[in-house]
Amino acid sequence: MARRNEERGDRRNREEERDSEIVEKLVHINRVAATVKGGRRFSFAALMVVGDQKGRVGFGHGKAREVPEAIRKATEEAKKSMIRVPLRESRTLHHDGAGRWGAGKVMVRAAPPGTGVIAGGPMRAVLETLGVQDVVGKSVGSSNPYNMVRATFEALKAQSSPRQVAAKRGKKVSDVIGRRADGASAAQPAADAEG
């Protein structure tokens, strides 16, 4: 029995450690009203994005009569819905991608070192909490924060690392990224043959 309690304590400590590393960003807060027979009843809706800045990110939506409670609910939901996104060199995305949710469309592009996070509003919050340091993002269509966040997540879910692509195709990573054993790229022999 004592051992089980120790294990439970360890699990709680690990969860607390993991939570202490998580960065939380409030993307949007909205006052909503329900019309009831006595007039209007106001409540607040919060949209939060959380991430560990090491490739994990999640978003959540919370509603409550008070702002802090709405934020707490949104944060809890965001922590439960976290996804892992493979990052190249722990600083950028592996490839360009696009996502769509409703009328909101977003495009994300991998960028060279020193570019920074070039993205606006809700998209920027998602990419910063993910831990991306160099990326270019563009939003087209709806600027509704909920649609933008969801569209960004759709684009991020489509990201795959060379290792994942190689496993899916049943090949070696070096075959997928086009490198040969001698270090020349696969495109080199074709260029040599033409010239």
Curated annotation (Swiss-Prot):
Gene Ontology CC annotations of this record: small ribosomal subunit
Coiled-coil residues = none
Record field: compositional bias (Low complexity): 183-195
**Region feature (Disordered):** 164-195
- Domain S5 DRBM residues, every copy: 22-85
Instruction: State the family it belongs to.
Output: Belongs to the universal ribosomal protein uS5 family.
Print the domain comment field: The N-terminal domain interacts with the head of the 30S subunit; the C-terminal domain interacts with the body and contacts protein S4. The interaction surface between S4 and S5 is involved in control of translational fidelity.
Please state what the protein is called: Small ribosomal subunit protein uS5
Recall the taxonomic lineage recorded for the source organism: Bacteria, Pseudomonadati, Pseudomonadota, Alphaproteobacteria, Caulobacterales
